[in-house]
Each structure stands twice: as structure tokens, then as C-alpha cells.
Amino acid sequence: NIAILVRAIFQTREFEERFLKIGMPYRILGGTKFYERAEIKDCIAYLRLIHQDKDDLAFERIVNNPKRAIGESTIKSIHEFSKINNLNLESSSKKMIQENLIKPKAKIGLSSFLNLISKWRNQIKVNKINHVKLLQVVLDESGYSAMLKNKKDLENENRLENLKELLRAMQD
């Protein structure tokens, strides 16, 4: 058995990737595995939804992250509409907005979110931006980075470091 000590939790990513690659079992003590951290899962969900509009799990994870005034009742009504009409959550949201079935405040947030997703999809097609640049744009334009920067505490500083580490990992 061996132990590896790191100063900051984001530094575990390279070890984790190497251990996974060679099939070596490992445990993280005093922290969460890199790809299981909320901010990393959020980034991956953004990228998944941008590339696949039918990804309801990704949609649900990020539709109100950061906060966009989209409450649980709105999410529930989107789910119900989706089941009744046999549509994915993104398509249901668009249709509900068109038919004025969303409360005004939530409608603004949901429309803004859908417009961003559409804009990023278009940037991939038209500008051919790579996945690293895309994630940088998503973090800035979605307000995700600003959300973490505005809450000045150690946990959010670590989350920002984790996002930087994810971008580095994507460049490798």
C-alpha cells in the first residue's frame, strides 16, 4: 500500500487518471474524486447538453445552475409536459415558452438559458471552436465562474481551481 499526499484537492486529478488508466484501485480520503465533484459534473453536463439536445439528465442538472429563477414547480411542469407530449425536456421547454405555459419570471430565465445553449451550438458549427475554448466560453457566459467568484470562501476558491484543472485536463 502507498499513500500520496497533496496540498490541494485539485492536484489529485492526474493521479486519478493515471490509476484508472493502469487499472490500479485507489481511494480518496478527505475529499471527493475529481470527476465526482459538483462543479466538474456541472461542466460535463453543459458540454453534454450542448452536444446532445435529448440529454434530459444534463438539462435538469444545469437548467437552474447558476440560478435563473426556475423553480421546482417549473421543472415539474416541464417534466409533465414532456411525458404527455413525448418530448425531451429542452423541446418541452421551448414549446411551453411558445405557448405561454411558463410563469413570466421563470420564462425569462429559461429563455435566456435556451438562447445560450443555442448560441454555443452555433459557435461550434460556425466558428469550429474546440471543446476547451467552448468550456471557457460556457463558464463565462453562463455566469458559472462569476457565481463562484462572488462567494468569496475557500470552498469556492477550490472549485475555481478544479475548473482550471478540468480545462488543463481537456488540453492534454
Per-range role (PLM):
Residues 76-82:
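C-terminal helical "lid" of AAA+/P-loop NTPase domains
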Residues 17, 21, 80, 137:
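Surface-exposed charge patches
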